[in-house]
Amino acid sequence: MSIFARVAGTGSYLPELRLTNQDLVERLAKTGLETSDEWIKTRSGISARHFAAENELTSDLAVRAAEAALSSTGINSADLDLIILATSTPDHLGGFPSTACVVQDKLGAHTSCAAFDVQAVCAGFTYALAVADAFIRSGSYKKVLVIGAETFSRILNFQDRGTCVLFGDGAGAVVLEASKEAGILSTVMHADGSQRDILCVPGRAGNGEVRGSPFMTMDGQAVFKLAVKVLEQVAHEALDKAKLKPEQIDWLVPHQANIRIMEGTAKKMGMSMDKVIVTVHEHGNTSAASIPLALDSGVRSGQIKRGQHLLLEGVGGGFAWGAVAIKY
């Protein structure tokens, strides 16, 4: 008998501090950096983003999203077998202890609930779903919490107009459970380390110092060109693996990086933007959190309904990309 990983529920959280484009324009002007609401919107589709408070950690955002997801299912944290957290901005320098372990403790999950982080930047949530799906299909775990959470505001260079206006903080989560009913239909992951320098944090820690820049850097044109190309390819791979055609997809739920990338991908897929869940205008690029944020938004708005076919896809630094086909 086949076992599927079914999406039992979703949840999300955005920090209280919301900065509109104009708020950011005024903040940057104080440091001598010029930009405008029109410049930001035209190039990205972003109108606002949320930043975590000084005392708010990635794990705090993750817990809020996780609690919302659990609440939507009636499943308790004590019932969880596994927690997988996708993040590039962990609570601790060096990435350990894992932020997933911190979340496990804050949620009050049992020590029998395993917990670990996955790092694939903006593709992280698709990677985490693929890992969770494999564990559930193998029969190893029955109830898995998958989270994408980021505090990217802490690695932004506010002297770099090309990046600091694009990113925000947030978290999204899904609860997966073993089911006889179809859920996750296919997963595909890819990586190309030769493209690692076009989107990265170049600094390295050593002997108590950061050698190189501690801020993220991005070659925007190179990222755009590669992203549109690989997203179309991986989307078709996931659909072929799930034995679906593009016209059978009810909703494309893409990584919310840039409206132009989403429009380019939809066009190459032959899909109308009316079938794309778009939330980038509300929170900017939240890296690993963006797909689950968009997914939960679609569920809460009533756009995404049970029985519909969804295609999730994301691409990020590494270079890494992935896609997941789901019957919701």
Swiss-Prot record:
Keywords: Acyltransferase, Cytoplasm, Fatty acid biosynthesis, Fatty acid metabolism, Lipid biosynthesis, Lipid metabolism, Multifunctional enzyme, Transferase. Catalyzes the condensation reaction of fatty acid synthesis by the addition to an acyl acceptor of two carbons from malonyl-ACP. Catalyzes the first condensation reaction which initiates fatty acid synthesis and may therefore play a role in governing the total rate of fatty acid production. Possesses both acetoacetyl-ACP synthase and acetyl transacylase activities. Its substrate specificity determines the biosynthesis of branched-chain and/or straight-chain of fatty acids. Gene3D superfamilies: 3.40.47.10. It catalyses: malonyl-[ACP] + acetyl-CoA + H(+) = 3-oxobutanoyl-[ACP] + CO2 + CoA. GO terms for molecular function: 3-oxoacyl-[acyl-carrier-protein] synthase activity; beta-ketoacyl-acyl-carrier-protein synthase III activity. One of its GO terms (cellular component) is cytoplasm. The lineage of its organism: Bacteria, Pseudomonadati, Pseudomonadota, Betaproteobacteria, Burkholderiales. This is Beta-ketoacyl-[acyl-carrier-protein] synthase III. Disulfide bonds: none annotated. PANTHER family: 3-OXOACYL-[ACYL-CARRIER-PROTEIN] SYNTHASE 3, BETA-KETOACYL-[ACYL-CARRIER-PROTEIN] SYNTHASE III. Residues 256-260 are annotated as: ACP-binding. Pathway: Lipid metabolism; fatty acid biosynthesis. One of its GO terms (biological process) is secondary metabolite biosynthetic process. It is an enzyme of class 2 (transferase). Belongs to the thiolase-like superfamily. FabH family. Coiled coil: none annotated. The keyword NADP does not apply. The active site is at 122, 255, 285. The last Arg residue of the ACP-binding site is essential for the weak association between ACP/AcpP and FabH. It comes from the Bacteria.
